[in-house]
Every structure is written in structure tokens, then in C-alpha cells.
Amino acid sequence: MPKIPPYNGFELGPIRPPSEAYSLLLRINRGCGWNKCRFCGFYRDVPFSIRRAEDVKKDIDLVKYWVDVIQNRQPPRQAKSEADYEALSMAYHWVQSGMRSVFFQDGNGLLMNPDELTDVLEYLNQTFPQIQRITTYARSDTINRLPLERLKRYRELKLNRFHIGLETGNDHILKMMRKGVTKQAQIEAGIKAMAAGIEINEFYMPGMGGREYARQSALDTADVMNQVNPDFIRIRSMALAENLEMYEDYEKGILTRPIDIETIGEIRLFLENLHGITSWVDSDHILNILLELKGRLPEDKDRMLALIDFFLDLPEDTQNLFRLGRRLGIMGQLSDLHNEVLVDKVKQTMDQAHVDKTNIDAVCDRLMIRAIPI
């Protein structure tokens, strides 16, 4: 285990799920304990270490101090460091958001020693008893190693939602991408977490298997969801940056990069094959084309499929206009195609940048890469 750095003030990790935008962020460990996935570059240069429980509790104390200042329960002092300012900023944001949820950063909060994590959870609840939800990223293999009773204890202490990177249910792609887990292990982890009373949020990454494995990935991933029935299914379209290890597969011709239209087709096949579950589906990530693709299964399934079909049935020029509008952040949903101001703005950009059907795919790919910190 790498040497744990000394406490140097309040820490923030690099990322969080979009759904945790209003949560207090507390860093439980630095980097990713696995850090071998060929499709991910978030933590490549971050040495992994698990923070001491005492250091996390110091972060909690600092946030509590600034919360009390903001709520006029404590006389203010001058912030002393950049870390102090980060704690103040986080406390202010959290107070404005209602102080109901907490997200543990970085890659897998369950890697902390179970007794120490329990200690942190107890302290967090004592300090902020109004908290309703505590969440963390969690790997399926880690969930499977933990006793069910330990997971139930976490749930009692309000650690009641896991964000799980399923990515795909296809074993071949999982092995190719060095995910370190099998389809069956992902099913078992999801069922186990839910048996403990913990909500699970499964991430699906369409496009990961290229054109070659898109169909099988959609079907196998749907099969996992059908067996687990997760509380949330969140779609995260694949973005292919040159600094990712998986980029080599595309250079060698092992995989072929799908374009937006093909990725949406994969998503449609996935949704079409979800049966007998009651999950909430959400397409809330900046990399997704159809942000309005969301709803409760099974009642909203036909509406979501109809939305996809509406896009796929658009003329190619209109599809390309919307794709560029989304990638530039000018358009947010398909209804924006009826907004003449936004349509004209995208058309002007296409004319000025000489974007047409011969280069739209390459342009959109570059814009996707710019949208994420990898």
C-alpha cells in the first residue's frame, strides 16, 4: 500500500457523477484502487492512497465550522489557505443546496477499512444529523467481498446509494477493456447491494465495444439490468481520447469508432430489451446526444423509444445540425430544433467552420473529447 500523505487540509477529488451536483464532496481516497481500465484516464497520474479516517473527520470538522459561520452560529475567521477556501466554497454550496446529501470521492469509497469507514459514517451523522443520503462510487468486486451485514450497517448509517460502473454486460468487452470483473460478478454485486437495502445506480457506456460489439453489448447489458432491477440506469456515451489505452484498438483496426447515430441505435436496442424492471433511466451526461431521454420503466419505455425513433427518422442534415448544436452546447434537447435563433446560430457556425456531412463525425468526436477532463 502506498504511503499515506500527511494531512494538508480539506481535499477535493477530480470528478463526481452529475446527479451529485448538490452534494457535499468528501474525499475518502485518492485515485482509483484498480486503475487498469483501458477506457478511463481520470486517475492515471494520481497515486492511489486511502485517506486516514482521522483526516476525513478533520475535513468534516472544517466544513462544519464554515457551515456554522454561514448560518451565523460562529464568528468568522480569515481563510488561511487554498484548502480552507475550498472548504468554505463547498460549505456555502452545500448550505444553499439544503445539506441533504454527501458524496464520497474518489474511485471506490468501499476500499477504506470497514471499521474506519463505519467510524467516518458515524462521525458524519453525528456532525450533520440532517443528512438523508450518502453515496460513493463502488466496484462490483469490492461489494462482493464485503459481508452482507456490513453493507446493512452502512445502510443504517445512511450510506444508501452506490454508483457502480457496469459499463457493459458483455464479458468479451469487459476483458478487452481490463475492467477486472465479469458479467456474473456484476449481477451478484447489484443483487447483494439491493438486498442490503442500498440503492444502486448502474452506469451503461454505449459505444465501448465499437461497431463490432455494439449489438451484443446492448443485449448483454440489458440482461444484467433485467436480473438486477437497479434503482437507476444512467447512460454515459463513450468518448475516445488518444491518451486512453483503448485507442490502440482503434488504430489497429480491432474496433471501429461508432458515430453518434450508431451509438443512439445501440441505446435503442438496449432499451428495447429491458423487461420486467422498474428502474429510472437517465441520459444526464454531457456526452449524450439526447439529454431528454429519461423516464420510469416500464410506463415510459414506449415514449423513450419514440423519442429515439424521432431523432433517427430526421433528415441527415437536421440530425447533423442537432449533433453539432449539442456538442457546442448551443442546443440541449430536440425541441430546440424549433427555435429559429438557435438553429441559425448553429448554421452560422457550420458555415464559418466549414462543417458538412464529410467532416461532421470528426468534428463531433473532437468536441466530445474537449467536454471531459481526460
Where are these regions (language model features)?
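Conserved SAM/AdoMet-binding glycine-rich loop
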Residues: 65-196
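Canonical Radical SAM [4Fe-4S] cluster-binding loop centered on the CxxxCxxC motif
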Residues: 15-77
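Aromatic/hydrophobic pocket-lining residues that form the small-molecule binding cavity
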Residues: 56, 117, 147, 186-187, ...
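Catalytic cores of alpha/beta
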Residues: 146-152, 210-227
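Conserved, mostly hydrophobic/aromatic
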Residues: 32, 40, 56, 104, ...
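Hydrophobic faces of well-ordered beta-strands that scaffold small-molecule active sites
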Residues: 24-26, 102, 134-136, 162-164, ...
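Auxiliary Fe-S-binding modules of radical SAM enzymes
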Residues: 1-20, 226, 232, 240-374
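Conserved strand-turn element in the central/C-terminal portion of the radical SAM core barrel
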Residues: 141, 165-175, 192-217, 236-242, ...
